[in-house]
Amino acid sequence: MTQIGPFDLEKKAAVVAVILEKPLETSKKAAEKGADILEVRLDLLGIRNPESAAKIIREIKSETGLPVLVTNRSVAEGGKWEGKEVDRTELLVALLSLKDGPDAVDIELSASREDRDKVIKAAKAHGKTVIISSHDFSKTPSPQEMTATLAEMFLAEADIAKIAVMPGSMEDVLNLLKVTLEFKNTGKTVCTIAMGKPGKHTRVVAPLYGSVLTYASIESNAVAAPGQLPVDEVKKIMEMLK
């Protein structure tokens, strides 16, 4: 069984609201709009201190009752972390050891093996869910490359393997969905996203093919990645497609 906090991803896909500003205020708003999980983006919030991050996560969980996924995205993968790579991953390690800390962590496949393994080890030691991710903002790799990337994530001990790609055509989108379905049929837990305008519909359609997480914005004018839709709209459409 794959869970983030108490949310069972084998029963249904989760709508993840991305918290990128005014963390407590937007988290409450996301909960009101129907979010299942909150992703706290430390890099976008400009949080570099473990104590500050822990306090915010604690308050968010207390106020909303929702599970929290913590992410501290590197610049290379579309994030805004400024500073040493070791400090970026050590911040995640520190938070994962807390009893009332995050329920899950997202670490990039592109992180150094040493730093990535420290984050994964800390998460596993404290019963937290591990998402290993890869983001390509320029293209959609071939089906073989996407399959190999997801497989590498599972070898690295991902609970959830996540890829986000930029399609140049609807064929690219179909290839991503086909790869998603293939992993679902082998019992693997994946999250797949096609970004930008051609991939916008995958935000609500990919779960039908086996993607267990779909990322959404709280406001339509504040998105963390191209093509994100508002939480309440995603929830509504997903309910209609059930």
From Swiss-Prot:
Pathway: Metabolic intermediate biosynthesis; chorismate biosynthesis; chorismate from D-erythrose 4-phosphate and phosphoenolpyruvate: step 3/7
Binding-site list for 3-dehydroquinate: E39, V40, R41, R73, R203, Q228
EC number: 4.2.1.10
Record keywords: Amino-acid biosynthesis, Aromatic amino acid biosynthesis, Lyase, Schiff base
PANTHER family: 3-DEHYDROQUINATE DEHYDRATASE
Similarity comment: family membership: Belongs to the type-I 3-dehydroquinase family.
The protein's name: 3-dehydroquinate dehydratase
The species this protein was found in: Methanosarcina acetivorans (strain ATCC 35395 / DSM 2834 / JCM 12185 / C2A)
